[in-house]
Amino acid sequence: MKIFLDTANISEIKEGIDLGLVDGVTTNPTLISKEAGGSKKYAEIIKEILKIVDGPVSVEVVSTKSDGMVEEARKIHALGDNAVVKIPMTDEGLKAIRKLSQENIETNCTLVFNPIQALLAAKSGATYVSPFVGRLDDIGQDGMQIIDEIKTIFNNYIIKTQILVASVRNPIHVLRAAIIGADVVTIPFSVLKLLIKHPKTDEGLTRFLEDWKKVSPDGKFII
């Protein structure tokens, strides 16, 4: 399963890359607006992310009409070969996805909340579908259940559209996505850090270092 970072923060992206754990990045206008300010402009941030990330980088359109979405998508696509255009799951969005698919521009259908929406996006030619599991949890549903259902539907019909699990809130979401067989999970940097940490790991490391001081009182490596 691929891991994308859901952020527009350059420092977070660079640290994730240094860890060897970042296969791509997803952004949205909210995330980018948090970083845009002072000398940094919206487009500059997008260009910088596209430059430092080898994998796919999702950048969202803001138009609500298909013609506007397509126009914005072409501009996003021109910024880099790894740019993926995020298109909302609406009737106008589906029209745009179909058109962009015909132009070989990769798309990520966002704001998906049920399996049928995912199927429709795939039929329109979306490269990725992004079901928002955390937001479904917020209203009392089991967000990960729809990932399981989407996976079953896509397997039934050998659909190549990739399942990109979004709105991830915790490591359990990541675990369940991996067990189900989702193609990608996009996570905040804070969740990435939680995946690495475990109290027993910290406890074991502390014990090893304490025991090492019995061999080398100053703690230095002596080989």
UniProtKB/Swiss-Prot annotation:
It is an enzyme of class 2 (transferase). Gene3D superfamilies: Aldolase class I. InterPro entries: Aldolase_TIM, TAL/FSA, Transaldolase_3B, Transaldolase_3B/F6P_aldolase, Transaldolase_AS, TSA/FSA_arc/bac. Pfam families: TAL_FSA. GO terms for biological process: carbohydrate metabolic process; pentose-phosphate shunt. Its EC number is 2.2.1.2. SUPFAM superfamilies: Aldolase (SSF51569). One of its GO terms (molecular function) is aldehyde-lyase activity. Its main location: cytoplasm. The active site is at K86 (schiff-base intermediate with substrate). Pathway: Carbohydrate degradation; pentose phosphate pathway; D-glyceraldehyde 3-phosphate and beta-D-fructose 6-phosphate from D-ribose 5-phosphate and D-xylulose 5-phosphate (non-oxidative stage): step 2/3. It is found in: Cytoplasm. One of its GO terms (cellular component) is cytoplasm. It comes from the Archaea. Belongs to the transaldolase family. Type 3B subfamily. Transaldolase is important for the balance of metabolites in the pentose-phosphate pathway. HAMAP family: Transaldolase_3b (MF_00494). This is Probable transaldolase. It comes from Thermoplasma volcanium (strain ATCC 51530 / DSM 4299 / JCM 9571 / NBRC 15438 / GSS1). The lineage of its organism: Archaea, Methanobacteriati, Thermoplasmatota, Thermoplasmata, Thermoplasmatales.
